């Protein structure tokens, strides 16, 4: 299944706020109206919606998300927590969380168009897994800096997660450590996502 490119507001009206997909918010009470219209949700639908929430927020294809779930399942620790860490440490998501891109699709475009350096080298793979002590910066070109400055100027200036440091005047961010789960930028029950996939096999 390909990456979603359809109407974004339609998704947030059904699934709730998805800040990685769009900075728009559903109108207050719209989720309650949808719920009353559709009646009581089945357990399958609840798990499906949590999976969709994760997929659309991080801008993943179905195949990509399944791959991350399998990697997380083989790692030590809680599969759900490891899954969120893997997704949060993607380069496109790090750029978004730093405020250097307005959304994750916007961050992906910056990376694809070779505007971004990791540790001084161009990285054009949005799924690149960032590590502690990585430095993420704009290329030393006017166009790259303008794109990032525009995003920094329009970002909502929310509190930065403690695993990241932003140096806005240098168009640069630092990864201090692996993300703590309490700083994940999405209201999600990751265990339901893991359950969804475990029941598909």
UniProtKB/Swiss-Prot annotation:
| CDD domains found in the cross-reference section | S4 (cd00165)
Q: Which GO terms describe its biological process?
A: translation
The record ties this protein, via Pfam families, to:
Ribosomal_S4 (PF00163), S4 (PF01479)
Q: Which superkingdom is the protein from?
A: Eukaryota
Residues covered by region (Disordered): 15-44
Q: Which UniProt keywords apply?
A: Chloroplast, Plastid, Ribonucleoprotein, Ribosomal protein, RNA-binding, rRNA-binding
Residue ranges of domain S4 RNA-binding in the record? 89-150
Among InterPro entries, the record links this protein to: Ribosomal_uS4, Ribosomal_uS4_bac-type, Ribosomal_uS4_CS, Ribosomal_uS4_N, S4_RNA-bd, S4_RNA-bd_sf
Q: Keyword rRNA-binding, does the record have it?
A: yes
Entry's Gene Ontology cellular component terms: chloroplast; small ribosomal subunit
- What is the protein's known function? One of the primary rRNA binding proteins, it binds directly to 16S rRNA where it nucleates assembly of the body of the 30S subunit. With S5 and S12 plays an important role in translational accuracy.
The record's note on quaternary structure and interaction partners says: Part of the 30S ribosomal subunit. Contacts protein S5. The interaction surface between S4 and S5 is involved in control of translational fidelity.
Checking PANTHER family in the record gives: 30S 40S RIBOSOMAL PROTEIN (PTHR11831), SMALL RIBOSOMAL SUBUNIT PROTEIN US4M (PTHR11831:SF4)
Family named by the database record: Belongs to the universal ribosomal protein uS4 family.
Q: What's this protein's name?
A: Small ribosomal subunit protein uS4c
Please tell me the species this chain comes from.
Lactuca sativa (Garden lettuce)
| Classification of source organism | Eukaryota, Viridiplantae, Streptophyta, Embryophyta, Tracheophyta
Q: Which gene encodes it?
A: rps4
């Amino acid at each position: 299944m390909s990456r979603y490119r359809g109407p974004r507001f339609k998704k947030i009206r059904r699934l709730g706020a998805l800040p990685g997909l769009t900075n728009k918010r559903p109108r207050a009470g719209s989720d309650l109206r949808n719920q009353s219209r559709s009646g009581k949700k089945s357990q399958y639908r609840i798990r499906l919606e949590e999976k969709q929430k994760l997929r659309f927020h991080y801008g993943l294809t179905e195949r990509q998300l399944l791959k991350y779930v399998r990697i997380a399942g083989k790692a030590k620790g809680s599969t759900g927590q490891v899954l969120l860490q893997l997704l949060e440490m993607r380069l496109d998501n790090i750029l978004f969380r730093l405020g250097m891109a307005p959304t994750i699709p916007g961050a992906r475009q910056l990376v694809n168009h070779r505007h971004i350096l990791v540790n001084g080298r161009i990285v054009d793979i949005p799924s690149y897994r960032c590590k502690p002590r990585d430095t993420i910066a704009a290329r030393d070109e006017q166009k790259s800096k303008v794109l990032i400055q525009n995003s920094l100027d329009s970002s909502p200036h929310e509190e930065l997660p403690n695993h990241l440091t932003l140096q806005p005047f240098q168009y640069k961010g630092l990864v201090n450590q692996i993300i703590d789960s309490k700083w994940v930028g999405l209201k999600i029950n990751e265990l339901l996502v893991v359950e969804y996939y475990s029941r598909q096999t």
